[in-house]
Amino acid sequence: TLISDISSKAIGQSISIVAHSMGGLVVRDTMRLHWDNWNQFISRKDSRVILLGTPWMGSHLIMQVFTGHLSRVRQLNLLDTHHTKEELIRVFNAYPGLYDLLPVPKGSDSFETPEFWEQINSELNSDKIQIPPLLDYFKKYKNEIQSFKPNLDNLYYLAGKDDLTTCAYRIRKTIFGKKLQYLGTPEGDGSVTWSLGIPKNLPAERIYFAHNTEHGNLANDEKLFEGIRDLLT
């Protein structure tokens, strides 16, 4: 693995990782799939891992991709004159990495079951929401993440802040019929809620908040650089 290669070359040196968003899931999978290499790395003197807005246990925003409600999906649909929105969603649904971003905590929605998606269509009296084809893959992945007990030694989390972050959904009655509505919480960075992003059991003294920086700018906001540098030293 890359981390073992770097570790073998950086003899006697500390190694630190700053991972933004999904990069933190690469860190988590390195922990999970290369446990021995990870423990050798993180036990090095002064080694650190800083996660910037990582969706550690997923993001509710991803359901909006599958249902076609995410603003980026709608924008792509406007720009792409050769494919319908349904065709675009069918392309997105084929990428396993997208499923890796769905919420996975115990007690979360049963995204891994066809019945979950069928129920939404039933309540909307519609068939527009596609049943994602890789649900078996996601079910296996979800079970693996739920059973994984990570080593959080020397790991820090920097959470951003935005006005609202998608945290749930509901079926709402309107004069035009029933509509799928997404709900937001102020406790999030615009893409990832704090409750899903911040790893459970991470000590409070290793959790930091950037109250004026949203998700996409956590690695770009120069006002944060000095604080990140301090955590690395």
Predicted regions and their residues:
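Active-site catalytic motif of lipid deacylating hydrolases and related acyltransferases
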Residues: T1-Q13
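Short coil/turn segments at beta-strand junctions that form active-site/ligand-binding loops
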Residues: I11-I15, D153-N154
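Glycine- and acidic
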Residues: I15-S16, A210
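Gly/Ala-rich beta-loop-alpha elbow adjacent to hydrolase catalytic centers
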Residues: A19-G23
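Hydrophobic beta-strand residues of extracellular immunoglobulin-like
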Residues: G24-L25, Y156
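Hydrolases whose catalytic domains are alpha/beta-hydrolase-1, hotdog thioesterase
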Residues: V26-T30
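Helical cap/lid subdomain of alpha/beta-hydrolase-fold lipid enzymes
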Residues: R32-T233
